[in-house]
């Protein structure tokens, strides 16, 4: 088994268990489900698919952007560059930072929003790549349903991109539903939504045709007005193909740190507010 991401996956897995535990507690309080939340916060379970990092010293280790060349090797280096590790509790709501990772990122509007599953038609800029990743994640995270993610992802993936089921986002949703005692796919008693708040560019190739971007938002579980919320991020390798940004062929991107938007941890990763 690959071990390239085990440490990052372990931290993120703890964050997902905490978020799912909060969601499950909301459901338990309302429908009388008898659960033991303590089991969710016990010793780390080994990740079955995440790969664990080398020392975080490469591009993206401090949350900053990076570049260097073009072609498959340069793209793989950007995708695989480690991200800052954060504790699982960093995903829960807590005090906002007085610091900033930089000015807000203004996102463009899509040229096509009707008749498509995921809005598309963003300009050939880094902001366009971020905006496309935001829309894909927003649609794909609806209901925290791995099947919905697969449909949205497949509609925007270049041939040769990592299969949807092998992406960290899909694994996150599977883990969240399992920990929250929800069915693997399909409707649930709760409404689960993801609202984008922040983003960063981890790096791009010199020609700008390949961009690794990470987006962060609030994952909200609502059951009849009772709400559990937390931060959940998603990193995607994006490639400019014709007049569109698509999820790039080649390796998947490093796991996005799960942080509460606007917190010190989010700022340290490099997340900046997004505006439209």
Identify the role of each PLM range.
Residues 5-44:
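Hydrophobic single-pass membrane-targeting/anchoring helices
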Residues 3-6, 146-242, 252, 259-265, ...:
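Structured, amphipathic secondary-structure segments that form assembly/contact surfaces
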């Amino acid at each position: 088994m690959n071990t390239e991401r085990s440490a990052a996956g372990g931290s993120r897995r703890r964050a997902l268990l905490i978020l799912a535990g909060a969601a499950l507690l909301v459901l338990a309080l309302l429908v009388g489900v008898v659960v033991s939340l303590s089991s969710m916060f016990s010793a780390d379970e080994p990740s079955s698919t995440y790969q664990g990092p080398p020392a975080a010293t490469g591009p993206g280790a401090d949350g900053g952007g990076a570049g260097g060349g073009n072609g498959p090797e340069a793209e793989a280096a950007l995708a695989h560059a480690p991200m800052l590790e954060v504790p699982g509790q960093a995903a829960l709501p807590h005090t906002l930072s007085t610091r900033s990772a930089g000015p807000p990122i203004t996102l463009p509007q899509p040229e096509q929003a009707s008749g498509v599953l995921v809005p598309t038609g963003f300009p050939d800029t880094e902001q366009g790549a971020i905006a496309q990743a935001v829309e894909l994640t927003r649609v794909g995270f609806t209901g925290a349903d791995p099947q919905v993610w697969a449909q949205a992802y497949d509609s925007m993936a270049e041939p040769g991109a990592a299969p949807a089921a092998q992406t960290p986002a899909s694994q996150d949703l599977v883990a969240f539903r399992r920990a929250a005692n929800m069915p693997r796919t399909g409707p649930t008693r709760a409404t689960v939504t993801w609202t984008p708040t922040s983003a960063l560019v981890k790096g791009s190739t010199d020609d700008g045709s390949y961009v690794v971007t990470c987006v962060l938002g609030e994952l909200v579980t609502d059951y009849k007005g009772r709400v559990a919320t937390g931060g959940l991020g998603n990193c995607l390798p994006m490639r400019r193909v014709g007049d569109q940004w698509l999820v790039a062929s080649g390796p998947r991107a490093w796991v996005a740190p799960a942080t509460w938007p606007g917190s010190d941890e989010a700022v340290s990763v490099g997340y900046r507010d997004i505006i439209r």
